[in-house]
Amino acid sequence: GQISGSGSEALSDGTHFAKEGVVFISNNRRLGAEGYLYLEELFGDGVGPGNLGILDQIEVLRWIQRNASKFGGDPDNVTLFGISGGGAAIQALVSTEGSKDLVHKVIPQSGGHSAQRRELAGQISEFALRRIGIKPGDIDSLQKTPWRIFPEIYEDIEALGLGSPQAYLPMISESMPFHP
């Protein structure tokens, strides 16, 4: 999902693709609260804008544009493939302005996509911070909080029943202007 996973898992092994002459690049992105917590309304502009996991993927695509040809790849023929949460992530990614002209084809496998409204993302973020004892605007406490605490409260957030069965999702925003 958007909570855990890695580009180094067995399903992300590109050996078989490489044997067929395909340049295969696997990546990681921030997940869970670190990738999708929306904090700007609670802490001000520039702090936790949400969608950091998506922005990570855009940076990977920019890297591919600059470097694919060095590995025999074609930067004008980039296909994204994702399984489960990775499939959902690439669906969100291609709905962003930042991915324009960086992606040419997508293969989302077994990953339906969901995004949340800014208001819902703000409610979830506010609850998460309250649950771990951080007051809005207390940036020092937030910075000292180990990120491993956020997965521990994931079930509490889902129990709120605010909408999606997943607490940390991409957010519809200026960078992702419509629901994929």
How should each PLM-predicted stretch be described?
Residues 1-136:
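Serine-hydrolase-like catalytic core of hydrolytic proteins
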